[in-house]
Amino acid sequence: MNYLIGIDVGTSATKTVLFDEEGTVIASASKEYGMIQPQNGWAEQNPGDWKNAVLETLSEVRERSGVPAGAIKGIGLSGQMHGLVMLDEDNEVIRPSIIWCDQRTGGQVEEMLQIMPRERWIELTANPPLTGWTAAKILWVKKHEPENYQKCRHILLPKDYIRQVLTGVFATEVSDASGMQLLDVQGRCWSEEVLRALDIDRSLLGEVYESCEITGTLLPEIAERTGLNADTIVVGG
């Protein structure tokens, strides 16, 4: 029988579950972590906490299940939306992630509405500018932490940071990307109009995949650490 793993990078914990091909839970593990609140209305987390939680729980479910590594065929990712993860040229995290419930970006939302009418935002991204979404967070960092923005080479969502940790691939999938306010939702691709309007370089963003598409396989060092095979696939969502 073949098996699959699902990883949910949540706000309070990461949970990893091993299923058989009929959907029966074989083993599960979770690891909690905290939130940073530097000011009222701000909410951040350390991406390194997610990374450690994922690697630990992957190892745990593999060990607890006793399932041969070769029988585990794929990994699916889900997680908290809208969070901003910024990596430098060495793929190191630049600053804590500004997560979905952070409300500091009211000024950036107003700026976005001045740049483009509300109706056009809805036409392109299926939503008006919102404080919790990623685009406003990017603008906040550009304005208040220009030195961090200048160092940034990759912008990722939380589960896509985990994808990069596991596979080395910079990618996202349509359901999560739709919450960044940068996606042409109907076209299912990054909106060149939005990126130009906000002066965000397309090269900072990963490729967009459908949720069921294969985005990569495990890096050898990750496979060794978790007890999985390096040919284990990781899908978009």
Question: Residue ranges of each PLM-predicted region?
Answer:
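N-terminal glycine/serine-rich phosphate-binding loop of ATP-dependent small-molecule kinases
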Residues: 1-95, 123, 151, 206-207, ...
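Carbohydrate-associated surface elements
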Residues: 102
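Conserved donor sugar-nucleotide recognition element shared by glycan-biosynthetic enzymes
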Residues: 47-50, 54, 105, 134, ...
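Gly/Ser/Thr-rich active-site cleft segment
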Residues: 9-11, 121-237
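Residues that scaffold the ATP/ADP-binding catalytic core of kinase and kinase-like folds
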Residues: 96, 108, 165
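Hinge/lid segment of periplasmic solute-binding proteins
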Residues: 106-117
